[in-house]
Amino acid sequence: MITKLNSNLLDVTIHFTDNEHYYSYTVSEIYDPKKADFFKQFFNYDPIVCDVTCNNDLVSTVIHDYLDSDYIFDIIENLNELADGKTEDQFLEKLELLHVYYKCVDAPEIKAACECVEDQNYIQISDCWTDQDLGIALASERGLLHQLEKISTEDTCFENYFDFDAYGRDCRIVEDWQKYNGSFWKFWEN
C-alpha cells in the first residue's frame, strides 16, 4: 500500500510497503524544461489536497495543480490499486505496463532514478538569493527576458506569469533548484 505520495511536475515519489518491507521509488516524467511550450502546461497555482489511503487511514497530500487535475488523481488511484496487497515484483511488473501512459521511466530504472548524481554535477547561481533573482537570471540566460518584462494579453509561453518571483518559483519547483548558503543550485543531469 502506498504510504506517502509527493508530487510536483517532474516527479512522483512512492513509498511502498507490502506489510513486510518498505520501498521507495521515484517515477520521473519526461519533459524538456528548455522548450518554451513546456511552460504552457501550467494551469494555475492552486494546490490540490489529495486523500491517499494509508493502512485504512486517509493521508492528505498537497499536490500543485501544474498538470491536469484528473491526470493526477488517475495516477493516485491507479498506484493505490497496484500497491494494495501486491508484492514488490508484482507492483513493478504492473507499473512497467503503465510506464507509457504515465510517461514514466521503465520499471527496472526506477531505483536508479532515485540515486543522486555525483556531487560535481551541479550548477550554481551564487548571486541569486530570492525566487525573483532566480527568475530574472534564468529568463536572461534563455533569452526570454523581454517576454517577461512586457505585460501583454498575447498568447505567449509566459501568459500565466505576472512577475519574476512567480516565474522563479516555478523554475525552482520544476527544475529542482535548491537553496543552499544563500544561493541557488541544482543537479545537472548529463
Where do the PLM segments sit?
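Short, extreme N-terminal segment that most often corresponds to the first beta-strand
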Residues: 1-33, 37, 182-190
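Short, flexible coil/linker segments at or flanking structured domains
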Residues: 2, 13-15, 86, 150-155
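Phenylalanine-focused residue identity feature
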Residues: 16, 38-43, 73, 91, ...
